[in-house]
From Swiss-Prot:
Interacts with ECF RNA polymerase sigma factor SigL; this should inhibit the interaction of SigL with the RNA polymerase catalytic core. One of its GO terms (cellular component) is plasma membrane. The keyword Acyltransferase does not apply. An anti-sigma factor for extracytoplasmic function (ECF) sigma factor SigL. ECF sigma factors are held in an inactive form by an anti-sigma factor until released by regulated intramembrane proteolysis (RIP). RIP occurs when an extracytoplasmic signal triggers a concerted proteolytic cascade to transmit information and elicit cellular responses. This is Anti-sigma-L factor RslA. The chain crosses the membrane at residues 116-136. GO terms for molecular function: sigma factor antagonist activity; zinc ion binding. Pfam families: zf-HC2. Belongs to the zinc-associated anti-sigma factor (ZAS) superfamily. It comes from Mycobacterium tuberculosis (strain ATCC 25618 / H37Rv). Residues 137-250 are extracellular. Changing residue 65 to S: No change in Zn(2+)-binding. It is a single-pass membrane protein. Keywords: Cell membrane, Membrane, Metal-binding, Transcription, Transcription regulation, Transmembrane, Transmembrane helix, Virulence, Zinc.
Length: 250
């Protein structure tokens, strides 16, 4: 059985419905008109009743269901160009070149749409980058943390640890950073240490804890709201007992 040529509307007296469809029923030419919404209400109900029992017409409608979406993406100029380039549709059916022309036009339109979207996205990204750059520059204009020298800490309860401490005053308090190396032999136990800030009022605040691993340098850091001039000392202590091992008095 040969596939029918699909028409644009229901059969009429112009001879269009005389085209052979292979199954010789007059509904074979109604599929395109149904998909495009060109049938009258009565014809639409009649065709839908026919579809319930005709797999041929159901398949034809399925094949054409994407055409309205394709047509909706064409502008007036593209439709005019297709009309000029496509051969005239005669009573024997639609030209086989029409659908490829539609698809090519839609492809060009989508390509332009993707290009416009890409340009718009790039422009938005550029604006965002400029905003971030301005924000970073504005932030960098704020006072920077002054370089702070690393001060050695005195060994108090051990000779197996050595450390330096850097103390930086900030508008919000104090930032403290240690570089603590464990000098114990490889077979020594890995003790847990803690950094403690001693205030001039006698308060003690634990800022960080870490594991002392022989031969390795730990870099614990912490912040505290206490101003630098209110800090009496920074200590490294045994986390479990509180024994002072290293200390830097201020």
């Amino acid at each position: 059985m040969t596939m029918p040529l699909r028409g644009l509307g229901p059969p009429d007296d112009t001879g269009v419905r005389e085209v052979s469809t292979g199954d010789d029923h007059h509904y074979a030419m109604w599929d395109a008109a149904y998909v495009l919404g060109a049938l009258s209400a009565a014809d639409r109900r009649e065709f839908e009743a026919h579809l319930a029992g005709c797999p041929e017409c159901r398949g034809a409608v399925t094949e054409l269901c994407g055409v309205p979406a394709l047509l909706s993406q064409l502008d007036r100029d593209e439709v005019a160009a297709i009309s000029e380039s496509a051969p005239t549709v005669v009573a024997s059916g639609l030209s086989p070149e029409l659908l490829p022309s539609l698809l090519a036009a839609v492809h060009r339109r989508r390509r332009r749409t993707r290009l416009i979207t890409w340009v718009a996205s790039s422009a938005a990204a550029a604006v965002l980058a400029i905003g971030v750059l301005v924000g970073v520059q504005g932030h960098s204009a704020a006072p920077q943390r002054a370089a702070v020298s690393a001060l050695p800490m005195a060994q108090v309860g051990t000779q197996l640890l050595a450390s330096t401490v850097s103390i930086s005053g900030e508008p919000w308090g104090t930032f403290i950073n240690l570089r603590c190396v464990c000098l114990a032999p490889p077979y020594a136990s890995h003790d847990t240490l803690a950094m403690v800030v001693v205030g001039r009022d006698g308060s003690q605040t634990r800022l960080a804890t870490w594991l002392a691993e022989p031969g390795h340098t730990a870099t614990p850091a912490g912040s505290i709201s206490t101003p630098v001039d209110q800090i009496a000392a920074v200590q490294v202590v045994a986390a479990d007992t509180g024994q002072v091992l290293l200390q830097r008095s201020l």
